[in-house]
């Protein structure tokens, strides 16, 4: 590598966002791809303009691979000890099959877990007093506990040793993964062995657990190829698939939640905390039977606020990654040749902050998508939904590889914000710590502290 390229690559760790934004202004607006150097993803990335989004998502997996690009980020063989979680992504198929339509089944258990965790993290009002909490860590514990109900059931969701281990694994998966995996396995492996035993002895008509772990076992048991079935039913591989599911779910949902609450601290004059409280209170006052999927769906203002946070802040400046796997490379519609092994993607943060797609894009408007939803245009209203992906909203991806868990994520985000505002007052002693760009990712300021107090 030439010295100039080495220096450029090193600088990309902290300047990638700036370079992509500059390239977007100079090239993407002219419908031209451009290249940025990257130390974290050798040797460089090709950034496509928004006009090529459809071309990207319609490309064959054998030409532009989603899974190979993902593996370059998560290093599945080293971080999770298996490449099968991506070459045969059963957990993705299962999440798409069960979670999109299963929210109502989980709602009572998820709400109970949310309230219990908030009692522990933010106080239960007995005695009623203000307390200081680390915002990022407390929200991470809340999200992790709620997701655990859906992934592994209530027993492990309430096991604090397991919750501590799985949270550490999610945060530090690339650092001390061997030790952390052992801690998780010590709790998860006995449950897997019990489930495998019970599944083999289960009689027709008998009830069985309804969570990700059981769905995995059922799917693996139904594989027709005996050799594949034997491999997939190895308990260690089941652990790996569960860990991967946590990794792609908990941290990203928590970042979105943290960004949403942090925006409230940066824009206190807008008083979004009270806005969300008022909406949630009105919905529950109509019917005191508690949260249902139908009621969560009515949190339009909260949903708009979360989606605007994702648009305005986001968590990455380069998304919709694909890796060129065609041996001879591929040619884009404008004639640009991409050699084998090239990583391409879209400048998501720049697109989300483009006035052509979002009027006054550089200003935060928590009601932006509520206004669109209340418009007379049916297509515009549907596009305002948090779970709606498009060429101009890429937070959950787009096309056939759009995030399959986004429906559960949306419900969790809305539910947490509603419950927090209903149950607590919040004070910002100082503005939230600024997040920082590292490579193509936005890292939350994890030292932000807020004061919270249970409402009367």
From Swiss-Prot:
Pathway given in the UniProt record: Secondary metabolite biosynthesis
Keyword Heme: yes
Molecular function (Gene Ontology), one example: oxidoreductase activity, acting on paired donors, with incorporation or reduction of molecular oxygen
Keyword list, A-Z: Heme, Iron, Membrane, Metal-binding, Monooxygenase, Oxidoreductase, Transmembrane, Transmembrane helix
Cited Pfam families: p450 (PF00067)
Annotated GO biological process: secondary metabolic process
Positions that bind heme: 403
Transmembrane segments: 243-263
Residue pairs linked by disulfide bridges in the UniProt entry: none
Taxonomy, superkingdom: Eukaryota
EC code: 1.-.-.-
Similarity remark: Belongs to the cytochrome P450 family.
UniProt xrefs under PANTHER family: CYTOCHROME P450, P450, PUTATIVE (EUROFUNG)-RELATED
UniProt function note: Cytochrome P450 monooxygenase; part of the cluster that mediates the biosynthesis of a highly modified cyclo-arginine-tryptophan dipeptide (cRW). The first step of the pathway is perfornmed by the arginine-containing cyclodipeptide synthase (RCPDS) avaA that acts as the scaffold-generating enzyme and is responsible for formation of the cyclo-Arg-Trp (cRW) diketopiperazine. AvaB then acts as a multifunctional flavoenzyme that is responsible for generating the cyclo-Arg-formylkynurenine DKP, which can be deformylated by avaC.
Protein name, UniProt field: Cytochrome P450 monooxygenase avaH
Source organism per UniProt: Aspergillus versicolor
Taxonomic lineage from the root: Eukaryota, Fungi, Dikarya, Ascomycota, Pezizomycotina
């Amino acid at each position: 590598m030439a010295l100039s390229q080495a220096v450029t690559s090193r600088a990309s760790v902290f300047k990638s966002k700036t370079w992509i934004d500059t390239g977007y202004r100079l090239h993407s607006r002219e419908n031209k791809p451009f290249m940025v150097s990257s130390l974290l993803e050798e040797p460089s990335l090709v950034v496509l303009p928004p006009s090529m989004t459809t071309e990207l998502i319609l490309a064959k997996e054998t030409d532009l691979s989603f899974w190979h690009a993902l593996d370059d980020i998560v290093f599945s063989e080293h971080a999770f000890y298996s490449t099968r979680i991506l070459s045969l992504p059963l957990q993705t198929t299962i999440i798409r099959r069960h979670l999109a339509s299963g929210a109502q089944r989980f709602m009572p258990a998820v709400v109970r877990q949310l309230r219990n965790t908030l009692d522990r993290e933010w106080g239960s009002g007995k005695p009623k007093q203000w307390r200081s909490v680390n915002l990022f860590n407390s929200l991470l514990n809340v999200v992790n506990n709620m997701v655990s109900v859906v992934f592994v059931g209530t027993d492990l969701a309430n096991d604090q040793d397991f919750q501590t281990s799985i949270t550490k694994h999610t945060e530090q998966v690339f650092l001390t993964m061997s030790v952390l995996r052992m801690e998780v396995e010590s709790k998860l492996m006995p449950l897997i062995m019990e489930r495998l035993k019970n599944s083999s002895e289960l009689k027709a008509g008998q009830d069985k657990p309804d969570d990700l772990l059981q769905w995995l076992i059922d799917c693996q048991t139904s594989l027709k190829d005996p050799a594949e079935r034997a491999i997939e039913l190895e308990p260690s591989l089941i652990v790996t698939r569960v860990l991967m599911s946590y990794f792609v779910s908990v941290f990203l949902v928590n970042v979105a939640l943290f960004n949403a609450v942090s925006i409230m601290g940066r824009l206190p004059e807008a008083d979004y905390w009270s806005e969300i409280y008022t909406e949630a209170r009105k919905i529950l006052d109509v019917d005191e039977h508690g949260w249902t999927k139908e009621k969560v769906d009515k949190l339009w203002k909260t949903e708009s606020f979360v989606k605007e946070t994702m648009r305005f802040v986001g968590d990455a400046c380069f998304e919709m990654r694909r890796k060129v796997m065609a041996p001879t490379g591929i040619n884009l519609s404008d004639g640009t040749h991409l050699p084998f092994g090239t990583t391409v993607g879209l400048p998501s943060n720049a697109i989300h902050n483009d006035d052509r797609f979002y009027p006054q894009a550089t200003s935060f408007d928590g009601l932006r998508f509520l206004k669109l939803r209340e418009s007379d245009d049916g297509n515009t209203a549907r596009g305002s939904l948090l779970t709606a992906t498009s060429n101009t909203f890429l937070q959950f991806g787009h096309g056939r590889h759009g995030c399959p868990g986004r429906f559960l994520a949306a419900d969790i985000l809305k539910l947490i914000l509603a419950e927090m505002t209903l149950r607590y007052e919040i004070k910002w002693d100082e503005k939230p710590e600024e997040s920082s760009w590292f490579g193509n990712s936005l890292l939350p300021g994890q030292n932000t502290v807020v004061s919270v107090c249970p409402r009367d």
